[in-house]
């Protein structure tokens, strides 16, 4: 966080790392329309296949230090929005824009905030996120300028 506050030019790469590390989509299932082989395993037509995005976004063959949160990670070929192609999330650009806007506005006051309670995660097997992230101004700090 201190690095981002110190260098706001990292907002874009920080947004991508947040998406990789938190994987808003947990998993999707598909049905094979033909037999195929992947990783030495044969998948038969009609069988279900599931992609677990948090696992894919920590693939040690793709990411150096995959369990480390690094806002300077480059390249960052995460699959947070379903990868690429016809199943790519139509809201991906909006989500990225919203995250950039939020961080652009919060960066000046982030050092003045502290966590004020437990983070509450969504209870959902398909999408991830938080329903509550309570924060407050640090003692003796005024947020208004």
Where do the model's predicted regions map?
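Cytochrome P450
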Residues: 1-145
């Amino acid at each position: 966080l201190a690095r981002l506050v110190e260098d706001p030019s990292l907002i874009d790469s920080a947004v991508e790392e947040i998406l990789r590390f938190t994987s808003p989509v947990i998993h999707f299932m598909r049905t094979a329309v033909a037999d195929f082989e992947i990783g030495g395993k044969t998948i038969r037509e009609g069988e279900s296949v599931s992609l677990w995005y948090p696992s894919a976004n920590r693939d040690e063959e793709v990411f150096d230090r995959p369990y480390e949160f690094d806002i300077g990670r480059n390249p960052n070929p995460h699959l947070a929005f379903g990868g690429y192609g016809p199943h790519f999330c139509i809201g991906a650009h909006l989500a990225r824009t919203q995250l950039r806007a939020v961080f652009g506005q919060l960066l000046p006051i982030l050092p003045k905030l502290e966590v004020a309670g437990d983070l509450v995660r969504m209870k959902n097997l398909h999408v991830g996120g938080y329903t509550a992230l309570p924060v407050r101004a640090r003692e003796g700090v005024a947020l208004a300028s």
